[in-house]
Amino acid sequence: MAVRKFKPTTPGQRHKIIGTFEEITASVPEKSLVYGKKSSGGRNNEGKMTMRYLGGGHRKVIRIVDFKRNKDGVPAVVKTIEYDPNRSARIALLFYADGEKRYIIAPNGLQVGATLMSGENAAPEIGNALPLQNIPVGTVIHNIELRPGQGAALVRSAGNFAQLTSREGKYCVIKLPSGEVRQILSTCKATIGSVGNSDHGLESSGKAGRSRWQGRRPRNRGVVMNPVDHPMGGGEGRASGGHPRSRKGLYAKGLKTRAPKKQSSKYIIERRKK
């Protein structure tokens, strides 16, 4: 995956940096694995706005991605690498030996025609999904389950990876992209390798219109609002707004939002980096 810059022939081209899409091999998704996505525009079932700065954007269809990788022992061939508008990573279409088709998150370095496996007997190679107890210590992994059979919950966005650092009894110690070090049950599955499209973080839309195509509306600062609209609004002339707060009045910078008595805290060995 690489990125492409443009000559500044227009203001919108000047700062535009987008992916080259050179790894994409198909432009039309598998029809049996998609369904329509209804745009809410940030409104709930009563028509009331519950999330600001959303609305518009290009029409999308949801690709059904397999995060469980529960077809153990059945080989699958990578048929295509595709673009998914609903996530930063690319997706890969697998054709299983029994005829079933599934999408997975495409790891870095995955090629069309490669054969993938999942289960305890799978080799620790890129794209294969194994229980953590069968993965060698030091291996780079992604798509990690928090509970056995639940499906991947951690490390799913473009370019991310975690590392299996050690084993302690029935748990494995994982270092996550945030810097957090935590224990996860050894029977949980993970996929070998890092998530593809690693240059996604270098991309720049270049203009406001590209954000609107993606369904993002302009975001106003709280200090330019009226007091009725935001805790930081109002004041004579240009005011600082006082202590940074969210729209609901919570401190916006430095306040810990994690519940102090959360059950899973006992599995965290080292908190994430700031």
Swiss-Prot record:
Residues 209-220, 244-264 have a biased composition (Basic residues). GO terms for molecular function: rRNA binding; structural constituent of ribosome; transferase activity. Keywords: Ribonucleoprotein, Ribosomal protein, RNA-binding, rRNA-binding. The keyword Zinc-finger does not apply. Part of the 50S ribosomal subunit. Forms a bridge to the 30S subunit in the 70S ribosome. Belongs to the universal ribosomal protein uL2 family. This is Large ribosomal subunit protein uL2. The lineage of its organism: Bacteria, Pseudomonadati, Bacteroidota, Bacteroidia, Bacteroidales. The gene is rplB.
